[in-house]
């Protein structure tokens, strides 16, 4: 039977529940247990697809086209297991499902209430993951902080879950903060005690405490937490701050987190194989070189808006024994002060995705600078569209070249709305989303990087290259190096007279892994290394 681990968080938000859940999944997989990880988000949006990156951070896209929380990216990267729309649940999606059932008469005229209807729907979503993927263990992260009113239906649902499936099949894990108080020169357990008290008042007794702290948790402190929180001392786990999130699995493995969890779930405590993980950490901690690349974006004030891009560069750095330093550059600053001020000494320029006209001219200028100065360039989604706009304006002589998204009446819409998007009215979940095949053109940079004839990448867009301009593009030194299998949609472009200039309509960052860097990011970082040598 599938076992269930529920991860809650206390004291403060952004405590790191997602990294703890992902790390636990990594440790289970290292013991040959199959794992699926589910995120329950308490916000009323149906999904984060229409939320501002400043509000929510990155929207992570799964193979099946779900727009999900960025934590699903951590789950995939740490466990090397693809997630799906089943792994992302919000309060909004729960209420939507319940209200749809009510409209269909599924409740036979009964009064629809939070208990049992909402809680039953939540439990059904957890069971659905177990049924559809049949893992040994389902880890469920409950978003928010214990004590928040928004999380109460989820907490009530997981309280009931232990009774439904049996005590030995469920484990409650609480991630909490043990702060260091400089004035007192000691760590304090009181916030954790109160957080556990709040959880117990709901009817949930945590089995394991994962204690976030910036220094080691002394044995006496663990015993105190054990005493006041009614948790065995061996189940009080120190999760000390690490220099990289990829160190966390090794940190909590040393503390015995996976071993203790498996024992409490009555599963065989197998010996882990973490050799590959240890090797990548060693390579990360001892880079042979340092390079700096610029990320020119619209949302650079919040790095989480580009989380998968950042992590993909980390992965490529590991693969090349390099530390990739990021220079965050606002596209609007380039509009105001010029590209040279921000980009003249970087070894690579990456322009990621985004929506809306703000900052687009700055991105176009950054791409022009990369092209003219022969600086390695990688464009992603909107980054490719901006590369096409830059080509139109500065290479093809189409001064009015633009995207129909930004200027619907432009006389040169080099980027146009996909035909299937013409009659779409709703914004949420209606883009070209998820995994699609792409045929690679032989004898191109893309072909040398992928070394495959057909690849599969994840998309999230409404607009696409306008084929009316394809011949003009090809006549000016550019190549279409990737298309949809029928040749209709342009998915990759590159510029031949350049050390490394490639842009994609899809989002390769969603498929990069710490132990398997994505070919495009790997090629980009290698080109940036060569650029550093030439400088």
From Swiss-Prot:
One of its GO terms (biological process) is pyrimidine nucleobase biosynthetic process. It catalyses: UTP + L-glutamine + ATP + H2O = CTP + L-glutamate + ADP + phosphate + 2 H(+); L-glutamine + H2O = L-glutamate + NH4(+); UTP + NH4(+) + ATP = CTP + ADP + phosphate + 2 H(+). The active site is at 381 (nucleophile), 507, 509. ATP binds at residues 14-19, 71. Gene3D superfamilies: 3.40.50.880, P-loop containing nucleotide triphosphate hydrolases. Mg(2+) binds at residues 71, 141. Residues 1-267 are annotated as: Amidoligase domain. CTPSs have evolved a hybrid strategy for distinguishing between UTP and CTP. The overlapping regions of the product feedback inhibitory and substrate sites recognize a common feature in both compounds, the triphosphate moiety. To differentiate isosteric substrate and product pyrimidine rings, an additional pocket far from the expected kinase/ligase catalytic site, specifically recognizes the cytosine and ribose portions of the product inhibitor. Catalyzes the ATP-dependent amination of UTP to CTP with either L-glutamine or ammonia as the source of nitrogen. Regulates intracellular CTP levels through interactions with the four ribonucleotide triphosphates. This is CTP synthase. The gene is pyrG.
């Amino acid at each position: 039977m599938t076992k269930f681990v529920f991860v809650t968080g206390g004291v403060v938000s952004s405590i790191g529940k997602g990294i703890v859940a992902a790390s636990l999944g990594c440790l289970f997989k290292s013991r040959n247990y199959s794992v699926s990880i589910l995120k329950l988000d308490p916000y009323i949006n149906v999904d984060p697809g229409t939320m501002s990156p400043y509000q929510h951070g990155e929207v992570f896209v799964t193979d099946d086209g779900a727009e999900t929380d960025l934590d699903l990216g951590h789950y995939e990267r740490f466990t090397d297991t693809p997630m799906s729309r089943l792994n992302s649940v919000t309060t909004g999606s729960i209420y939507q499902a319940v209200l749809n059932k009510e409209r269909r008469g599924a409740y036979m005229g009964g009064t629809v209430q939070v208990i049992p209807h909402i809680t039953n729907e939540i439990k059904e979503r957890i069971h659905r993951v177990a049924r559809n993927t049949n893992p040994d263990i389902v880890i469920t992260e409950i978003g928010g902080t214990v004590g928040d009113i928004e999380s109460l239906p989820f907490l009530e649902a997981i309280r009931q879950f232990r009774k439904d499936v049996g005590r030995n099949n469920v484990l409650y894990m609480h991630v909490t903060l043990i702060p260091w108080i400089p004035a007192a020169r000691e760590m304090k357990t009181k916030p954790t005690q109160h957080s556990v008290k709040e959880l117990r008042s709901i009817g949930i007794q945590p089995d394991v405490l994962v204690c976030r702290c910036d220094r080691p948790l002394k044995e006496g402190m663990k015993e105190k937490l054990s005493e006041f929180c009614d948790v065995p001392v061996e189940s009080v786990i120190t999760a000390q701050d690490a220099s990289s999130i990829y160190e966390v699995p090794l940190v909590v493995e040393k503390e015995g987190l996976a071993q203790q969890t498996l024992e409490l779930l009555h599963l065989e405590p197998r010996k882990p194989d973490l050799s590959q993980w240890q090797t990548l950490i060693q390579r990360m901690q001892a880079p042979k070189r340092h390079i700096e690349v610029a990320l020119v974006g619209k949302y650079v004030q919040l790095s989480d808006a580009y989380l998968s891009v950042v992590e993909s560069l980390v992965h490529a750095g590991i693969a090349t024994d390099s530390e990739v330093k990021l220079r965050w550059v606002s596209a609007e600053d380039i509009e105001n002060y010029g590209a040279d001020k921000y980009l003249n000494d970087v070894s690579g320029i990456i322009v990621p995705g985004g929506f809306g006209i703000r900052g687009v001219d700055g991105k176009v200028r950054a791409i022009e600078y990369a092209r003219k100065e022969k600086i390695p360039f990688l464009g992603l989604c909107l980054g490719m569209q901006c590369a096409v706009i830059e080509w139109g304006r500065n290479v093809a002589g189409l001064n009015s070249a633009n995207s129909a998204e930004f200027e619907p009446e432009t006389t040169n819409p080099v980027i146009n709305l996909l035909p299937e998007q013409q009659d779409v009215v709703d914004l949420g979940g209606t883009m070209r989303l998820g995994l699609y095949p792409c045929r690679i053109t032989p004898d191109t940079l893309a072909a040398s990087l992928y070394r495959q004839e057909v690849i599969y990448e994840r998309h999230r867009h409404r607009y696409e290259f306008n084929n009316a301009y394809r011949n003009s593009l090809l006549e000016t030194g550019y190549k279409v190096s990737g298309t949809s299998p029928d040749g209709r949609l342009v998915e990759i472009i590159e510029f031949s007279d350049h050390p490394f200039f490639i842009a994609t309509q899809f989002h390769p960052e969603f498929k990069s892994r710490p132990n398997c860097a994505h070919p495009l990011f790997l090629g980009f970082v290698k080109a940036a290394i060569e650029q550093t040598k030439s400088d």
